[in-house]
Amino acid sequence: MFQKKNNEKLESFIGANSSFKGDIQTKGTLRIDGTVEGNIDTDWLIIGEKGSLIGDVRANGVIVGGKIEGMVNAKEIIEIKGKGEITGDINTPKLSVSEGAILNGRATMTKDTNVIELQVRSKA
């Protein structure tokens, strides 16, 4: 099992022999070892080596050991492990790609996910 850096407990799990169709919105950590078709909104997402997801992801952090087909937006980090694969665009401030991992898409790296409002200066 992948070790998360923030030591949160695993709260939701989709097992290896399970499949799910539909969107998932949950707090905490979601681990997928089965098959999911739908969009996911969670704090942390872990895709196990045999897990697969077809859909978009919005999370604080994403760890991919299996496959994701869709857009992935992470506020903190995306980690693609050695057998992991993402097909789709990603957006994150930190990206870790292990040897053997696959990223088929565009990666956008942002310094900060906070929006800063700019002040308009009047011409003197």
Predicted segments, located by residue:
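Intrinsically disordered, low-complexity terminal regions
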Residues: M1-Q25, T29-R31, T35-E37, I46-S52, ...
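Short, small/polar residue-rich loop motifs at catalytic or cofactor-binding pockets
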Residues: I40
